[in-house]
């Protein structure tokens, strides 16, 4: 009988600890908000090609601790020009994390995206101003001749 009581007491204590730990610092925010995507119109890229670029941006954005992404939009075909292509290729030349098989390759196309997001409400060790809406945050992607996109630069 004592053994059964001890098991129940231990189980109840463990449940209370788990509940308490799960509530510590936890915030019930509900489901993640929808991110509005605007691919606009492009005579250079298909919607599928632009969506692949958007997925790369979303994957990178996940590293923006505490930030909430609201929207991403394609900035238009005008960004794909010689000046921007030279700029992105110059940035690629100084990168140290290029796979050996891609060393020496150049971007053949450029795409710019703009995003809106909100920085963390809580004060923390973040690179962002607290509780602020960031608008038209730039994402610059270069495209290699095999069709792969790479995020080259982001920010203002």
Language model: regions and residue ranges:
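Sec-dependent N-terminal signal peptides of Gram-positive bacterial secreted proteins and lipoproteins
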Residues: 3-27
């Amino acid at each position: 009988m004592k053994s059964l009581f001890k098991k129940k007491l231990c189980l109840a204590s463990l449940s209370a600890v788990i509940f308490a730990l799960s509530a510590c610092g936890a915030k019930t925010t509900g489901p993640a908000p929808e991110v509005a995507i605007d691919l606009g119109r492009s005579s250079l890229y298909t919607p599928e090609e632009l969506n692949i670029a958007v997925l790369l941006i979303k994957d990178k954005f996940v590293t923006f601790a505490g930030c909430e992404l609201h929207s991403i939009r394609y900035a238009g075909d005008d960004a794909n020009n010689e000046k921007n292509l030279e700029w992105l290729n110059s940035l690629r030349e100084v990168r140290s994390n290029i796979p050996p098989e891609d060393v020496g390759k150049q971007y053949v196309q450029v795409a710019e995206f703009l995003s809106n997001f909100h920085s963390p409400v809580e004060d923390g060790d973040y690179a962002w101003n607290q509780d602020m809406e960031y608008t038209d945050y730039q994402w610059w992607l270069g495209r290699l001749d095999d069709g792969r996109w790479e995020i080259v630069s982001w920010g203002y």
